[in-house]
Amino acid sequence: MNFVYLVVLCPLVSFCLLLFFIDYLPKMLVKKIGIVSIFISMIITFYSLFDFLNCGKQCVFYIPLWVWISIDYLKIDFNFMLDGLSITMLTMTTSIGFLIHLFSSWYIKLQDEYTRFFSYMNLFIASMVLLLLADNLLVMYIGWEGVGLCSYLLVGFYYSKINSGYAAIKGFIITRIGDIFLILAIFFIYKNFGTLNFRELKLIFETTNVVENFKFLNYVSLFLLIAAIAKSAQVPLQTWLIDAMAGPTPASALIHSSTMVTAGVYLIARMNFLFSLSPIILYILGIISCLTIIMSCLSALVQKNIKCILAYSTMGQVGYMFLALAMKEWTLAINHLVTHAIFKTLLFLSAGAVIILLNNEKNIFNMGGLRKKFPMLYFSFLIGGASLASFPILTSGFYSKGNILFSALENNYYLFLVLGLLGSVLTSIYTFRMIFLVFCGAQKYRAHYVFFSRTLANTLPLLILILLSTVIFVLIHLPLSSVFSKTTPSFLINNNKLLFEIGCSVLSLLGMFISYYLFLVNRMLVDLLLNTKLGNFIYNFWYDSWGFNSLYNILCVNPYLYVAKRLKHDPINIFMSIPITFCFFVSKNLKYIHNGYLRVYVFSIMFGLFLFILMAIRLYK
C-alpha cells in the first residue's frame, strides 16, 4: 500500500521522458514506454485493491508524502487517501486506461505525432489518478486542472485543422467556468471550517450542527454543482462535449469513460456529506440530470456522425449518474459510472476501428452491411450498444440503470422516474439506429476498406470489454460500504422489483423494434417526416444542440468579438493623448514670449517685479 504513489509517478515519468525526447525515440520504444508505464500503474492498483479487500471494506489507508503549504495557521499536506471510493475509481481508470493505450498502439501507428499522443495520454491518466487519490480539496484541484489541460491538448491534437483548435479552446473555456466555481467553493470551505481534508470535513459535518449556516451550505453546494456539471457536460454547460470529438477516437474513449467526464460525478460523491444537507441543490441536480437525459437522447436521434452519437449518449448516461446522486443513491451512481465506463470504452474503440478501416468515414449513412465484412467489430459494437440500451438480462447496463430508476420509484420521485424511463426508450432507439445503419442493410460505403489485421493490440481490449459488458460484471461487488452509509438498497429484495425489471425490459425492446421499423423496414416514413416544415425545424433544432450554441454566440461570443474589435485600435490612446495635446498647446503659445526683443524682456521683468511687490504688501498687512 505504501507504493500507491507509483500509480501517479509512473505515467508522469513516462510523460516527461516522451516529452523531452520527442524527436529522438523510435515508435517501438515510444509504445513500450507509454503502455508499460500504465501497465505498471494497473498492477500496483490491483495489488492495492487486494490488500484493501484483505484488510476489510471498512479500512481507510492514508499515505503521507510531504507538507505542501505551511504558513502560520494554514497547513496543507500533500497526502494520498485510499478508501472504497478511490480504490474503485482508481482500478477503473488504470485498467481502462491500459486497454485504451494498448488499442491506441494499433490505431495511431500510422500517424506522425505518435510520441506526442502517448505523452498527452499518460499525463491525462496521471492527472486523473492524482484527482482520485487526493485526501484534500486543494490537491484534488491540481488533478482537476490537469485533466482539463489534457483534454484541451488531446481535443486539439490535430492542431493543423482549424476546427480542432476551436473545439479545444471551446472546451477549455467552458470547463474553466466550473473551475472558477470550484476554487471559490474551496476558499469558502476553508474560511468556515479551517480545513480542506476530506476526513476532517466529514467528521465536522457528522459531529457538529452545521445546518445552522443553511445559506452557506447551499452556496457552497451550488458552486460545487456548477463545477461538476461543467466538467461532466451537463445542461447548460454541455456544448463542449460534442466539439471534443475532433480529437483522436482513443482519446475520446478515455475522456468519456474514465477521466474527464466522470470527474464531476466523483466530486459530488466525494462531498456527499455536504450535499446531503442541501436538499434544494440535490433537487436542482435532479432536474438538470433529467433535462440532460431527454435533450441528449433527442439530439442523438438526428446525428449522422458516429462519434457525436456516442458523445450524446455519454451526456445521457452521466445524467443517470447525476440522477442517482440527486436521490442520495451514491453507490448506484458509482456503480453505473463503472459500468458505463466499460461499455462506452467498448463502443468508442469499436467505432474507432470502423472509422479507420473506412478511411476516416464517420457518417453512419455512408456505411452499412459491415457485419459481414467485420463480424468481430459487429459483435463488440452490438454488445456495447445493447448494454447502453439496457438490453434485458444479458447486459450490465440493464441492472445498473434499472436500479437507479427503481430507486426513483421507491423514493416517490415520479417525475424523475417518468423522464428516466422515457430516456431509456429513446436511448434504445438511437443506439439500435446506429447499429442498424452501420452494420446492417445494404453496403453504402464509398471508401475502400483498409485491411483489418487482427493483432493483440486491437483484439484483446475488445474481448475483455465485451466480457465485462455482460451480466458477468453484475457479480462484482464494489467496495463502497466504508464510504457511503446507504450502500445496500432495501429494494434489492423487494418483490416489486421483478415487475419493474419486466417493464424496463419491455421498454428497451420496444425502442429496439421502433428503431428496426423506422430505419430498416420503413425508411420512407422518416424521410416523409423530415420533409415537412415542422419536421425539418425540429431536426435542425435538435441537431444544433437545442440552440445552445446559437444562444451562447448571441450572449457571449458576439459581445466579446464586438468589444475586441473596438479595442483593436486601443481607444485608451484617445484619452492618453489629451495631456500631450495640452503640453503642445502651452509650448506653442509660450514660444511667442521668447522673440528676441529687449523691450519685451524689460517689460516682463518690470511686470513680474510689480506683481511680487503687490503680493509682499498684501502678506505684510
Curated annotation (Swiss-Prot):
Keywords linked to the UniProt accession: Cell membrane, Membrane, NAD, Quinone, Translocase, Transmembrane, Transmembrane helix
Membrane topology, as annotated: Multi-pass membrane protein
UniProt catalytic activity: a quinone + NADH + 5 H(+)(in) = a quinol + NAD(+) + 4 H(+)(out)
One BP annotation, GO: ATP synthesis coupled electron transport
Compartments where located: Cell membrane
ATP-binding in keyword set: no
A GO-annotated cellular component: plasma membrane
Lineage: superkingdom: Bacteria
Membrane-traversing stretches: 2-22, 33-53, 59-79, 80-100, 123-143, 169-189, 210-230, 249-269, 274-294, 306-326, 338-358, 374-394, 412-432, 460-480, 500-520, 537-557, 597-617
GO molecular function: NADH dehydrogenase (ubiquinone) activity; quinone binding
E.C. number: 7.1.1.-
Protein task: NDH-1 shuttles electrons from NADH, via FMN and iron-sulfur (Fe-S) centers, to quinones in the respiratory chain. Couples the redox reaction to proton translocation (for every two electrons transferred, four hydrogen ions are translocated across the cytoplasmic membrane), and thus conserves the redox energy in a proton gradient.
Family: Belongs to the complex I subunit 5 family.
Subunit structure: Composed of 13 different subunits. Subunits NuoA, H, J, K, L, M, N constitute the membrane sector of the complex.
Protein's recorded name: NADH-quinone oxidoreductase subunit L
